[in-house]
């Protein structure tokens, strides 16, 4: 079963209304479970939420996005701040907030070979291009935290 069919199934079971647009996986999403696009009505979902938290949590994320979807097309308040949205979300047992990932991003540590200053970065530094900002000495990777 593809994602659009799954979202339509959830919509019919939990809202008794069809989902008439498309649903897509969007691997660029990081902190959110999904997004609703009012302009064309499609939904994007974060595949990491499904992989990390499982089917039941993902179903609750789908319900959350479907609340936005159905309220928008009914002409009611579909934003998080609207009472219509809050009521419908509670009624269908959707998630209010996306769960936080338990995986921590690793950091990379660099040390200047001349003055010993340490730099902590989340992204790699091109050691051929960049130097220490204090003494212009060469940098060296000293260790990398585990993901």
UniProtKB/Swiss-Prot annotation:
Pfam families (alphabetical): SprT-like (PF10263)
Localization terms from the record: Cytoplasm
Cofactor(s) listed in the protein's UniProt record: Zn(2+)
InterPro entries recorded: SprT-like_domain, Uncharacterised_SprT-like
Cofactor note: Binds 1 zinc ion.
Active site residues per record: 65
All residue ranges annotated as the SprT-like domain in the record: 5-142
Keywords: Cytoplasm, Metal-binding, Zinc
Record keyword Metal-binding present: yes
UniProt binding sites for Zn(2+): 64, 68
Record GO cellular component, one term: cytoplasm
GO biological process, one term: response to stress
GO MF: zinc ion binding
Top-level taxonomic group: Bacteria
Family: Belongs to the SprT family.
Name recorded for this polypeptide: Protein SprT-like
Source organism of the structure: Streptococcus uberis (strain ATCC BAA-854 / 0140J)
């Amino acid at each position: 079963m593809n994602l659009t069919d799954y979202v339509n199934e959830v919509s019919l079971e939990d809202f008794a209304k069809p989902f008439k647009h498309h649903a897509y996986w969007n691997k660029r999403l990081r902190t959110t479970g999904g997004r609703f696009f009012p302009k064309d009505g499609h939904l994007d979902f974060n595949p990491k939420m499904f992989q990390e938290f499982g089917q039941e949590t993902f179903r609750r994320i789908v319900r959350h996005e479907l609340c936005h979807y159905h309220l928008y097309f009914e002409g009611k308040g579909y934003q998080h701040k609207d009472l219509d949205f809050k009521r419908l979300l509670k009624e269908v047992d959707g998630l209010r907030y996306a769960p936080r990932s338990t995986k921590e991003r690793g950091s990379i540590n660099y040390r200047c070979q001349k003055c010993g200053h340490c730099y902590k970065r989340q992204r790699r530094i091109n050691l051929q291009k960049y130097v220490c900002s204090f003494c212009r000495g060469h940098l060296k990777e000293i260790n990398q935290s585990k993901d």
